[in-house]
């Protein structure tokens, strides 16, 4: 699968992180396999969780293919980027097509990023998890890697005014 869009997006994201003055503490990146399919099951506390987790996978030389709600793919700016980075659109009313697409990607050796809570937790506590990540792992015979993000809620989350001016925010993945 050709990745023409992912590399320049990574450059832009890294510049954005530098502009924000974010301090990263990536722990356990040795658990991200350098080859073969796997699932990152990620808590969801902020709108930047996907980019933070994707950044954490880069030392393993891997791109994460995230499952994201269809509405993001319908956005005029985000949609082409999401498709170009081979992320997987999830229609919440009919998830079978996205399940099949994720299964196919896992069997092809891709890392899939899933937010099992299904949405951002406004309490910043882990909500009840949906079963899709485990069902995909069983179907593809791949490991599930539990992944926690902390700190992104200080930058941009639900029901809180976005503050991209905050500097030196510590982020742990």
How should each PLM-predicted stretch be described?
Residues 5-7, 12-44:
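Helix-to-loop junction immediately C-terminal to a conserved catalytic motif
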Residues 56, 81, 104, 135-139:
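Hydrophobic/aromatic ligand-binding patch that stacks against planar heteroaromatic rings
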Residues 105-134:
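Catalytic-site beta-strand/loop segments enriched in glycine and acidic/polar residues
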Residues 33-94:
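Catalytic core of membrane glycerolipid acyltransferases/transacylases, capturing the structured
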